[in-house]
């Protein structure tokens, strides 16, 4: 037994411990933190109502915050639970609040003997809340934690207590900031004090820094002395109402942020007298020394979360609720619904079939007594045939009949009509009556017991009267009938609900209206509002003011993005109102940057781009009116911080604000606004005609004590007392101005000029509209209204073409009027001009001009371009398309650099016209309008650049430096690259700001962006004029262009530029004016005229009047020019164009260039140059001419087989070896022409491949005969030189524009001295002999070779003729491959360099100059033919040929290697300058 005792003892102890340990304390112990104010019941505080349960409240910072508790005595709670409070420095989670048992109390008393009194006070810190006899107990604690305990044993309490007792709010908690008490917390304390006074029959008071409550003069305040806690318990500022107390002075102690103090008051003590200081509590306007109670209006709390949808499929509904904080001290109750419901669309219900309407109930089964009746319904299956409906087919119900009476039956009363069977297209309603009795024979009542009538006679909407399903902005809008409003969730980046109405057009077709986002708030703006509330919760004023600065900065950044909804604008107005109120309450002076940001935010909000958003937001709340009030309050907040005679000017893009402070006693001068000459003023203000003149007589108070209702607040309904400032709309608290006697000694005068506010304010009654800018004038304190109107206002129009203008002012007393809030009785219209209207008003307010808009305004808002713009663009486009079609049809014949430039120019004009029409549509989005403006800027500039490109092309053609491939790339860079560069730089610097506005899709007239178009256009016009002057001087110069075709082309380009460029400038200038001022019919008509004329002029100049196009059209029609030979590249034969190969064209161009080449040019203009140019790559630069040292010859390589004669020359007097002289070719208009130099041909055939290179720059073609060129004696020719043989008539008429060569001789030119003959022989060239055929007179023009040779011999093909013409030069091989060209080019260069070296060695010993002179004019070419077949030379001619061949062989082949005189062709005409001009004449021998 002894071993069992310890075991039993351990079991008992375990049970005891198990009973003592209760895990419930964690369930009935709660800790609350962050509670500012609340009233709680037992159910709220204690989830488990048991003894020892506790609820602990945490004070976040006892040094800054004070914790007040009010205990509302409830007898049942006190009797069953005995609640008490314990102030704690530390929170213990498992601390129990049970009272100790009597035995434990004795033990604790014995153990605590000898402890100090402080520890005893700590141990006895529990405060019995029910010890007092009064209904209230007020407690104030400065501890970290306050714990509420249930100390009694409520064994039967939960069951005995009534539900009302459990729900009774017996504890109220209030947390107050000692440094900055808010109006709400002070209002709660005042309410407690009033309730205490009413319950005790006297006034109760306690001290709290920063709070004061109204009381009656002479009343007393007493602290409660009822039985309560022991004297050891100190309750700071505590008031426990109870038993009698000695009377005391009734004064509520107050404090301020500059004079803070706290009083410790024990039970039975009286509060000390405190001085009166300035507070933030309102005071009576009639009795300044008496404090008034703060009026607290009811405020809605945040909406709760939406409930689940009422249906799991199909369409149901969702709801949410919100609670209202009750009003106090006569405040207004909360306005608006407490419950909000919306539709919800779930997934379609999985029903295969659909039941139709129930049929009517059948008759009752019995005529009397109880019975049953049935009804049935049908299943409508739209799917497969096997689908069925789920549910019962029939329905049965009981029918109660009366007992079968023994007497005759009768009908009972009719019941109510049933619901209509259809909602549209005529349904049916039924009602029934019962037969109350039957006859003795059991027969029913006579008559019918059912009655039917039609209902819902309105027709169902047709298919075209239903708006279809649409997916817009990530939202799906279900189909709806016309007139219905559909609600949907906001886009993912916002919260709230969006709505959209299905409208009906004038043609009876339903369409969706614009979605309404007035109830959508972006997440960024909601986060900013939460940040604002966090700053408001801060106790310190300085922190709250700095927080408001951060809020304004963040709001400016959000609005600068310009991506917000209409609901965000209303939310921003509310944020600005809270910021202004916080600045007032905290007495925080905003910095200059804060003021600038604030008004910049307002400028963003009232921008004209937000007109549609404001129209949408006005359907929910008059946000623009609220914004107007907030701006006025902020102006006076800034003005109060200014010094006397100090002013402030803030300028933004959409409003200008002037704030100044003037003393009441002496206003310095009259006030004029705005001051346009101030630095930093915007252009729209500087150039506007808006003006305000406020005479200083208006600025006078009505009386020293009570100013009159005037100023911006002086409109009807806006009068306030001298110590208050009217709050903005929706304010729940008013700003309290300090009771400073100097406050009313200064005027704060504010003036605001709004650029676009008239577009967003509620419109006046139709048909009027706000036609001018809006100006606001506000003065505080309010002034005495003058007896007669003295305020002069001039307002400029923002809508042109208006009629019947009226001056009006905004009436704040009718802010809720639906018809508008403009009042025309306050102002008088003095003068109306074309640009502005002058008004004279009596009261200070917000002013504007109301007028009737023009009739075409409705057409403009429809979104279609005006008729003149459409006509002008259409005519211009049709003309240009005609030009493009003609060029496309004959492109192979008119292809040139000028044609390519013209096509690009036409494309730029076509694109500009299309973009002008697109930009006039009002349905474009912001991004599309910006892109339209940028591309319009680009094509406008490109059209100017292509005109400049045409002028540049004509200039290059005039000076002869035209290289096709290289210049074409430069033309493209100038025509398209330069405009693209200008637009890219403009877009990069402005970030597309200014590209497109709310009124037009073009460059904005503000900010200087328009200079990005005007500047380059002006520079292009100036450069074009300079080039035109240069080209004109070149054409008119005596030594100008000799080539008639070049001269004609250059003149045509110059004339085109002179005509097209001014017309282009006028067209685009009128286009800019027509786009920016869409209501001006004059500008639109001018643009239509200029644009149409531009298209016709371009088509006429470059198509109908262009020679190439005329020739092509004539040849296509079979009418060709008869004066051109068929060898010409532009000639026709039998109505068909003669197509030349590329190589032939290059050869012909080279030959023509030789004849009409300018001085000092260095282009490949001969056959050799053509070959060298063809042998180069496309991107390779052509080589320059071979220029030797000064005084040396310049040779160019020639095509063909070059064999340098290396054989020794025969001796003197010996005949040279027989050889055949190669033909000589000269360049003519039609190509190469072979010269028949019979005096150079030996009798024997020569070897192939020998050439004689004649130097350039010395060829002289002069008419023969006496006195040619002014010389007395004809030039001699070497002895033995053969005379020219006469030509037949057939040969002389075969070539156009060439003179026949009557004589050709070699003579000694005086420019190079005499030739030093090493053999000592003297050569005397014989005098020239006139031709046997003819001798042309000086100055006579002879056409011996016509261009067109009729006859069958000239009917061969063009290609055969070209081959025959170039057969001697072996061009057939050259035309085969490009590689052959390159080989010939490099081979000729190498051989001629060797030949030049031989010539340079013999130049020093030769002093004579050989020249070849020929008859004919200086500007004509020499062409000769071969001798007629069968004609044999005479003996004398043969001897001359031998002597000449001997001389040639001796001089060119057998001279020693010494420096020789260069062999040149010399212009021997006496009328030519001494210094020979540069040329490029080359002849092949």
From Swiss-Prot:
It is a multi-pass membrane protein. Residues 1443-1452 have a biased composition (Polar residues). Residues 702-713 have a biased composition (Low complexity). Residues 690-857 form the GAIN-B domain. The keyword Chloroplast does not apply. GO terms for molecular function: G protein-coupled receptor activity. Residues 1475-1485 have a biased composition (Acidic residues). Receptor activity is regulated by proteolytic processing. The long N-terminal has a an inhibitory effect on the constitutive signaling activity. Removal of the N-terminal region induces an increase of the receptor activity. GO terms for biological process: calcineurin-NFAT signaling cascade; cell surface receptor signaling pathway; G protein-coupled receptor signaling pathway; negative regulation of angiogenesis. Residues 1272-1282 have a biased composition (Basic and acidic residues). Residues 1-20 form the signal peptide. The modification Phosphotyrosine is found at residue 1251. One of its GO terms (cellular component) is extracellular region. Glycans are attached at residues 94, 179-180, 254, 370, 493, 578, 800. Orphan G-protein coupled receptor involved in cell adhesion and probably in cell-cell interactions. Activates NFAT-signaling pathway, a transcription factor, via the G-protein GNAZ. Involved in angiogenesis inhibition. This is Adhesion G protein-coupled receptor B2.
């Amino acid at each position: 037994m002894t071993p069992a005792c310890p075991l039993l003892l351990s079991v008992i102890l375990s049970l005891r411990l198990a009973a003592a340990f209760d895990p419930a304390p964690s369930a009935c112990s709660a800790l609350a933190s962050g509670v500012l104010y609340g009233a709680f019941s037992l159910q709220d505080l204690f989830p488990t109502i048991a003894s020892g349960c506790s609820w602990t409240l945490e004070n976040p910072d006892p040094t800054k915050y004070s914790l007040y508790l009010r205990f509302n005595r409830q007898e049942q709670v006190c009797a069953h639970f005995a609640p008490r409070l314990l102030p704690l420095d530390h929170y213990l989670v498992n601390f129990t609040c049970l009272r100790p048992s009597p035995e434990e109390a004795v033990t604790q008393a014995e153990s605590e003997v000898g402890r100090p009194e402080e520890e005893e006070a700590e141990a006895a810190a529990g405060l019995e809340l029910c010890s007092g006899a009064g209904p209230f107990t007020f407690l104030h604690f400065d501890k970290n934690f306050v714990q509420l305990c249930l100390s009694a044993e409520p064994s039967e309490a939960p069951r005995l207590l009534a539900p009302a007792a459990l729900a009774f709010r017996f504890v109220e908690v209030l947390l107050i900031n000692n440094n900055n008490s808010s109006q709400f917390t002070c209002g709660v304390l005042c309410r407690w004090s009033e309730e205490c006074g009413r319950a005790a029959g006297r006034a109760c008071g306690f001290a709290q820094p920063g709070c004061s409550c109204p009381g009656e003069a002479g009343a007393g305040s007493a602290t409660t002395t009822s039985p309560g806690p022991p004297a050891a318990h100190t309750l700071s500022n505590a008031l426990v109402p109870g038993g009698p107390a000695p009377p005391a002075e009734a004064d509520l102690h107050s404090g301020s942020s500059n004079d803070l103090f706290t009083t410790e008051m024990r039970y039975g003590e009286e509060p000390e007298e405190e001085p009166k200081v300035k507070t933030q509590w309102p005071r009576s306007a009639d009795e300044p020394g008496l404090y008034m109670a703060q009026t607290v209006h009811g405020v809605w709390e945040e909406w709760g979360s939406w409930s689940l949808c009422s249906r799991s499929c199909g369409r149901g509904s969702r709801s949410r609720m919100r609670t209202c904080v009750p009003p106090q001290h006569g405040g207004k109750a909360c306005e608006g619904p407490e419950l909000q419901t919306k539709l919800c669309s779930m997934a379609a219900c999985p029903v295969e079939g659909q039941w139709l309407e129930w049929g009517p109930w059948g008759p009752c089964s019995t005529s009397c007594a109880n019975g049953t009746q049935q009804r049935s319904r049908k299943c409508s299956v739209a799917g497969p045939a096997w689908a069925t409906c789920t549910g019962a087919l029939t329905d049965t119900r009981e029918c109660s009949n009366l007992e079968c009476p023994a007497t005759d039956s009768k009908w009972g009363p009719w019941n109510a009509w049933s619901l209509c069977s259809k909602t549209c297209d005529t349904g049916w309603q039924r009602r029934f009556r019962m037969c109350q009795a039957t006859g003795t024979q059991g027969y029913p009542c006579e008559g019918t017991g059912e009655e039917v009538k039609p209902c819902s006679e309105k027709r169902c909407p047709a298919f075209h009267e239903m708006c279809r399903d649409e997916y817009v902005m990530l939202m799906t809008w279900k189909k709806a009938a016309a007139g219905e409003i559909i609600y949907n969730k906001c886009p993912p980046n916002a919260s709230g609900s969006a709505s959209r109405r299905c409208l009906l057009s004038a043609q009876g077709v339903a369409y969706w209206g614009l979605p309404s986002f007035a109830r959508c708030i972006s997440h960024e703006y909601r986060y900013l509002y939460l940040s604002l509330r966090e700053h408001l919760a801060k106790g310190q004023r300085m922190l709250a003011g700095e927080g408001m600065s951060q809020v304004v900065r963040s709001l400016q950044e959000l609005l600068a993005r310009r991506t917000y909804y209409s609901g965000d604008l209303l939310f921003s107005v509310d944020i600005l109102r809270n910021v202004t109120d916080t600045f007032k309450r905290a007495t925080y002076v905003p910095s200059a940057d804060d003021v600038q940001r604030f008004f910049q935010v307002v400028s963003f909000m009232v921008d004209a781009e937000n007109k549609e958003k404001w129209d949408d937001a006005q359907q929910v709340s008059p946000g623009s009116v609220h914004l107007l009030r907030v701006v006025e309050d902020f102006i006076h907040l800034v003005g109060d911080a200014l010094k006397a005679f100090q002013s402030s000017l803030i300028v933004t893009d959409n409003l200008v604000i002037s704030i100044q402070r003037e003393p009441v006693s002496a206003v310095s001068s009259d006030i004029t606004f705005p001051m346009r000459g101030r630095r930093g003023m915007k252009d729209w203000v500087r150039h506007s005609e808006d003006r305000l003149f406020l005479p200083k007589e208006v600025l006078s108070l009505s009386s020293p004590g009570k100013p009159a209702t005037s100023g911006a607040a002086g409109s009807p309904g806006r009068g306030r007392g001298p110590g208050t400032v009217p709050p903005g709309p929706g304010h729940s608290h008013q700003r309290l101005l300090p009771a400073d006697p100097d406050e009313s000694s200064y005027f704060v005068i504010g003036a605001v000029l709004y650029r676009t506010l008239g577009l967003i304010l509620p419109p006046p009654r139709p048909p009027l509209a706000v036609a001018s800018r809006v100006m606001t004038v506000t003065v505080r304190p309010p002034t005495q209204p003058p007896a007669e109107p003295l305020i002069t206002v001039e307002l400029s129009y923002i809508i042109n073409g208006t009629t019947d203008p009226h001056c009006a002012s905004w009436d704040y007393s009718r802010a809720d009027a639906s018809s508008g809030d403009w009042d025309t009785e306050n102002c008088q219209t003095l003068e109306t001009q074309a640009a502005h209207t002058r008004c004279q008003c009596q009261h200070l307010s917000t002013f504007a001009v109301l007028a009737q808009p023009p009739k075409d305004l409705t057409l403009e808002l429809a979104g279609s371009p005006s008729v003149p713009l459409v006509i002008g663009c259409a005519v211009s486009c049709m003309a240009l398309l005609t030009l493009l079609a003609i060029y496309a049809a004959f492109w192979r014949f008119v292809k040139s650099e000028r044609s390519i430039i013209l096509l690009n120019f036409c494309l730029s004009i076509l694109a500009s016209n299309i973009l002008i029409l697109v930009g006039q549509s009002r349905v474009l989005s912001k991004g599309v309008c910006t892109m339209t403006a940028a591309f319009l800027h680009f094509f406008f500039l490109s059209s100017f650049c292509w005109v400049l490109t045409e002028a540049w092309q004509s200039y290059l053609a005039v000076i002869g430096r035209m290289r096709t491939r290289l210049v074409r790339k430069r033309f493209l860079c100038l025509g398209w690259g330069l405009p693209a560069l200008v637009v890219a730089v403009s877009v990069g610097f402005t970030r597309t700001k200014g590209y497109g506005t709310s009124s037009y899709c073009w460059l904005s007239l503000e900010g200087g962006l328009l200079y990005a178009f005007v500047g380059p256009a002006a520079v292009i016009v100036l450069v074009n004029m300079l080039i035109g002057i240069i080209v004109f001087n070149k054409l008119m110069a005596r030594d100008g262009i000799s080539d008639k075709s070049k001269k004609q082309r250059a003149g045509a380009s110059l004339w085109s530029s002179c005509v097209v460029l001014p017309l282009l400038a006028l067209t685009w200038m009128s286009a800019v004016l027509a786009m920016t001022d869409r209501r001006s019919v004059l500008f639109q008509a001018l643009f239509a005229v200029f644009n149409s004329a531009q298209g016709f002029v371009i088509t006429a100049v470059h198509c109908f009047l262009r020679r190439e196009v005329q020739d092509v059209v004539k040849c296509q029609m079979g009418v060709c020019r008869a004066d051109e030979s068929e060898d010409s590249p532009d000639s026709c034969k039998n109505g068909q164009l003669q197509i030349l190969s590329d190589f032939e064209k290059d050869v012909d161009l080279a030959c023509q260039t030789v004849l009409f080449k300018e001085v000092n040019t260095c282009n490949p203009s001969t056959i050799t140059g053509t070959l060298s140019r063809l042998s180069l790559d496309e991107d390779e630069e052509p080589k320059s001419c071979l220029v030797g040292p000064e005084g040396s010859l310049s040779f160019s390589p020639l095509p063909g087989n070059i064999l340098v004669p290396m054989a020794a020359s025969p001796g003197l007097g010996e005949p040279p070896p027989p050889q055949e002289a190669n033909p000589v070719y000269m360049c003519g208009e039609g190509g190469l022409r072979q010269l028949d130099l019979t005096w150079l041909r030996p009798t024997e055939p020569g070897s192939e491949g020998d050439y004689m290179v004649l130097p350039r720059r010395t060829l002289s073609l002069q008419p023969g005969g006496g006195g040619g060129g002014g010389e007395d004696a004809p030039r001699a020719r070497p002895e033995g030189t053969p005379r020219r043989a006469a030509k037949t008539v057939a040969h002389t008429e075969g070539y156009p524009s060439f003179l026949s060569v009557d004589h050709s001789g070699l003579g000694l030119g005086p420019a190079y001295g005499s030739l030093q003959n090493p053999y000592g022989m003297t050569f005397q060239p014989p005098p020239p002999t006139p031709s046997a055929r003819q001798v042309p007179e000086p100055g006579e023009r002879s056409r011996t070779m016509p261009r067109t040779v009729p006859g069958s011999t000239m009917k061969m093909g063009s290609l055969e003729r070209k081959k025959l013409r170039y057969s001697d030069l072996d061009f057939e091989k050259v035309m085969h491959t490009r590689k052959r060209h390159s080989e010939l080019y490099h081979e000729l260069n190498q051989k001629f360099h060797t030949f030049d070296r031989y010539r340079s060695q013999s130049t020093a010993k030769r002093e004579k100059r050989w020249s070849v002179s020929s008859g004919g004019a200086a500007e004509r070419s020499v062409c000769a033919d071969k001798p007629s077949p069968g004609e044999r030379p005479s003996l004398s001619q043969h001897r001359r040929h031998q002597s000449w061949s001997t001389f040639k062989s001796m001089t060119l082949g057998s001279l020693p290697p010494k420096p020789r005189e260069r062999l040149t062709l010399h212009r021997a005409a006496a009328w030519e300058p001494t210094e020979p001009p540069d040329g490029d004449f080359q002849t092949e021998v």
